[in-house]
Amino acid sequence: MTTNLFNIFDPSTTIFNLEMNWISTLLIILFMPNFLWILPNRMNWLLFKMFNMLNNEMLMLYKMKKTKSPAFLFISLFMFILLNNFFSLFPYIFSSSSHMVFSVTLAIPFWMFFIILSTCKNTKNMIAHLIPLNTPIYLAPLMTIIETMSIIIRPMSLSIRLTANLIAGHLLMTLLNFNSLMIIIIFIQMFMMIFELCVALIQSYVFSILSSLYSSE
C-alpha cells in the first residue's frame, strides 16, 4: 500500500550508479516521423495535420509571412511537451513533465529570449507596452509596476499551470487504482485514462499557444 501519494513522482532508475530518470525525455526521438517512405504513413499524416493547424493559428497571432514566423519553434515546443506528457502515462516511465523543473526549464529560456530580443530590437514599443492605451497620466506609474510584475511572473504561471494539472491527474488516477475486475471499475479507469490523454494534449497546446501569445506582444 502506498503511504505517500507523491511517491509515484520519484522513482529511482540507476545504471552504474548514475541517475537515469530524465533519460525518458529523450524517448521522443524514437517516435518522431521519418521521411524515408515514399507514401506518408498515418503517424506522418496526423502530425502534419497538427502542424498545419498550429501553424495557421500562430500565423494569425504574428500576422507575418510563414518564412518570417517563429511558429515552428512553438510547434516543436508543443510536440516535445505533448510526447513527454503521453509517455508519463505509461507504467515504469518517469513522469518528467509532472516536475516543476521540467516546465521551468522550458518557460524561462523562452521568456528571457523574447524579452531580450524585444528590448534590443524594439525598445520603444517594449517600454510603451508597459502602459495600456488611454491610461490616465496619474495612473501611469502604478500601471507600469503592475505590467512589469505581470511580465515577470509569466514563466512561473506557465510552469505552475502545466505542472499542477498533470500532478492532479496523476494523483487522481492513483486514487482510483483499484485491483478489481468489476466492469464499473474498469470503465472508470478507462475514462480516467482518456481524460488524462485529453489533459496532456490540452496542456501542451495551452503552454505553446500562451508562449507564442506572450512573444507576439
From Swiss-Prot:
NCBIfam families: ATP_synt_6_or_A
Compartments it resides in: Mitochondrion inner membrane
Catalytic activity: H(+)(in) = H(+)(out)
An example Gene Ontology biological process: proton motive force-driven ATP synthesis
Predominant place of localization: mitochondrion
Entry-linked PROSITE patterns: ATPASE_A
Function of the protein: Subunit a, of the mitochondrial membrane ATP synthase complex (F(1)F(0) ATP synthase or Complex V) that produces ATP from ADP in the presence of a proton gradient across the membrane which is generated by electron transport complexes of the respiratory chain. ATP synthase complex consist of a soluble F(1) head domain - the catalytic core - and a membrane F(1) domain - the membrane proton channel. These two domains are linked by a central stalk rotating inside the F(1) region and a stationary peripheral stalk.
Membrane topology: Multi-pass membrane protein
Organism: Rhopalosiphum padi
Listed name of the protein: ATP synthase F(0) complex subunit a
